[in-house]
Amino acid sequence: MMSYYMDTTIGSTGPYPLARPGVMQGASSCCEDPWMPCRLQSACCPPRSCCPPWDEAAIQEVPTGLEHYSTDMECADVPLLTPSSKEMMSQALKATFSGFAKEQQRLGIPKDPQQWTETHVRDWVMWAVNEFSLKGVDFQKFCMNGAALCALGKECFLELAPDFVGDILWEHLEILQKEEAKPYPANGVNAAYPESRYTSDYFISYGIEHAQCVPPSEFSEPSFITESYQTLHPISSEELLSLKYENDYPSVILRDPVQTDSLQTDYFTIKQEVVTPDNMCMGRASRGKLGGQDSFESIESYDSCDRLTQSWSSQSSFQSLQRVPSYDSFDSEDYPAALPNHKPKGTFKDYVRDRADMNKDKPVIPAAALAGYTGSGPIQLWQFLLELLTDKSCQSFISWTGDGWEFKLSDPDEVARRWGKRKNKPKMNYEKLSRGLRYYYDKNIIHKTAGKRYVYRFVCDLQSLLGYTPEELHAMLDVKPDADE
């Protein structure tokens, strides 16, 4: 119900929302009150506050129209990042973060998110809603300027953002800030690309005969790569050597030998090696932090990822170590190695088969190890399910049915609880988890088995990715066919 009264400051009438009954001054917990009114030109919360405080004078502010949006945070068809075929992925990757650059140019949004007004923040959220087909987003939760938005911190931001897409939006915000903050390389290539940012986030394709890297324009046309990637532009090996790269997530950095002291990363420390046109050696990674969390989120599931990560980093390609995997990155032919004309042999099974640090009491397919192998960065839901399904201690609440890649959630609430614990989302439940599973339906990753409750089946080509047949896994886990089914 809206209340109508005269605003004496502007001399016109209009619908203004009344204060929400029962809201107390100074909410006890940040990011929990979505009923905060918007201000068009000034920040409604201090820079270090999660959400703007409620005050009586706020009802006198000019309405923005955002109060008419639903406050339902229901999320549907959120584009999670999953393995799939090249054909499906080439279509899905057309909707990229690079599309926001065009919006920035069209709407005059500053490149630095710190300079955004409330209107700019609203435009960014609207772009995300359209880009990822989000539904029921509560715009009032984002009534703040850019400085306040950036000051929220990841955990507080995730409380505001819709389920399953918060990590993506936060990374986009971080990328925008880092691109604005990065200095241009002090070399001759800078003149050729005066408006470029040289980060290996964009360096996703590598070959000795056709070496490519990405000096993306601020407003380049969208390409076929998702997330922060831009259109590839071929350059010569001489130009490649003069570029400086700073990788924000994976364990690979190409550095300008003259300016190594100026490069820093929050996630990995790198041992620099010589880069030549004929042999592009990769750095050796040590365990780091990603956004304040364990880099592979593997404390619970796998204790030996330090050694595995270090081993894989010397064999995986730039593409396979990207934080956000492309759909075609799960094909073995897309894993060029660091050495010229050499590709990693075998599958995930081959990487871990003979490793002494593989504990028999641990899952056959640790999610953290699989994430490191595929280069997906944060553990994805499908990887987490595979970890549980290959852990004998979890068979009481999730297990294979014995029919190929079909599995059953015997206790879906426990599966959701563990997923929430792994992703630091204590409010996770099966309803939210099932929305993630439903996204996999359209992408032909996982299908729901008709007529069977809580029974699903992997329909993608897991055997090629993992190197295991379902029968092999069943034998290793002592799985017996489910007679009841």
Swiss-Prot record:
Subcellular location: Nucleus; Cytoplasm
Binding partners and assembly: Binds DNA as a homodimer; homodimerization is required for transcription activation.
Residue ranges occupied by any PNT domain in the UniProt entry: 95-180
Name the record gives this protein: Transforming protein p68/c-ets-1
Region feature (Helix HI-2): 367-374
Job description of the protein: Transcription factor. Directly controls the expression of cytokine and chemokine genes in a wide variety of different cellular contexts.
SMART domains associated with the record: ETS (SM00413), SAM_PNT (SM00251)
This protein's record includes keyword Cytoplasm: yes
GO biological-process terms attached to the record: cell differentiation; positive regulation of endothelial cell migration; regulation of angiogenesis; regulation of transcription by RNA polymerase II
Gene3D superfamilies, sorted: Transcription Factor, Ets-1, Winged helix-like DNA-binding domain superfamily/Winged helix DNA-binding domain
Organism: Gallus gallus (Chicken)
Region (Helix H4): 462-466
Annotated Pfam families: Ets, Ets1_N_flank, SAM_PNT
Entry keywords, A to Z: Cytoplasm, DNA-binding, Nucleus, Proto-oncogene, Transcription, Transcription regulation
SUPFAM superfamilies named in the record: SAM/Pointed domain, Winged helix' DNA-binding domain
Ranges for region Helix H5: 470-476
Annotated region (Helix HI-1), positions in chain: 348-356
Summary of activators and inhibitors of this protein: Autoinhibited by a module composed of four alpha helices (HI-1, HI-2, H4, and H5) that flank the DNA-binding ETS domain, reducing the affinity for DNA.
Listed InterPro entries: Ets1_N_flank, Ets_dom, ETS_fam, Pointed_dom, SAM/pointed_sf, SAM_PNT-ETS-1, Transform_prot_C-ets, WH-like_DNA-bd_sf
Activation domain as annotated region, ranges: 174-287
GO molecular function terms listed in the Swiss-Prot or TrEMBL record: DNA-binding transcription factor activity, RNA polymerase II-specific; sequence-specific DNA binding
GO CC annotation terms, alphabetical: cytoplasm; nucleus
Family: Belongs to the ETS family.
Keyword Hydrolase (UniProt): no
DNA-binding region in chain numbering: 379-459
